[in-house]
């Protein structure tokens, strides 16, 4: 029985990248408001190390607000073709400006412009308003690198629980739960 859920996650992700043709790094991100209202949305995983799981967002978005107010999150990866899922719970912290700048520089130019143009999660009166904002920002940065907006950054979810689920016939699923206790991972199997 492995005692390193990060290694197990990497192995499962490698298999998912071979089996899943569309977005094997797609994950459901669950956050909650201060009033405990949950909200779930799909995101893309952009990095994973033993320190945690990284994704990027606009701090003005609902998820940005919720993670700043209530800095915990749950991630769920579901790989249908493999009949597997991984659920991760942990604290969410902002990544460094250097990390955010480095990732932002790798994004497609249109995505960089969109980060400046989007007032994410706020009402949009008409699509052409957004397209005009993109055109204006494109003109502003014509011939120049697009810098990262100060409100666009990443979060790292540092897990304290990681559950690996394998689908089995007749709903006799296999579940292994890893829990971080005093800096060490402990694992146990759970009934389906």
Swiss-Prot record:
Substrate binds at residues 46, 103, 107, 111, 171-173. It catalyses: pyridoxamine 5'-phosphate + O2 + H2O = pyridoxal 5'-phosphate + H2O2 + NH4(+); pyridoxine 5'-phosphate + O2 = pyridoxal 5'-phosphate + H2O2. Its cofactor is FMN. FMN binds at residues 41-46, 56-57, 62-63, 85, 120-121, 165, 175. Keywords: Flavoprotein, FMN, Oxidoreductase, Pyridoxine biosynthesis. Binds 1 FMN per subunit. One of its GO terms (biological process) is pyridoxine biosynthetic process. Catalyzes the oxidation of either pyridoxine 5'-phosphate (PNP) or pyridoxamine 5'-phosphate (PMP) into pyridoxal 5'-phosphate (PLP). PANTHER family: PYRIDOXINE-5'-PHOSPHATE OXIDASE, PYRIDOXINE-5-PHOSPHATE OXIDASE. Belongs to the pyridoxamine 5'-phosphate oxidase family. This is Pyridoxine/pyridoxamine 5'-phosphate oxidase. It comes from Zymomonas mobilis subsp. mobilis (strain ATCC 31821 / ZM4 / CP4). The gene is pdxH.
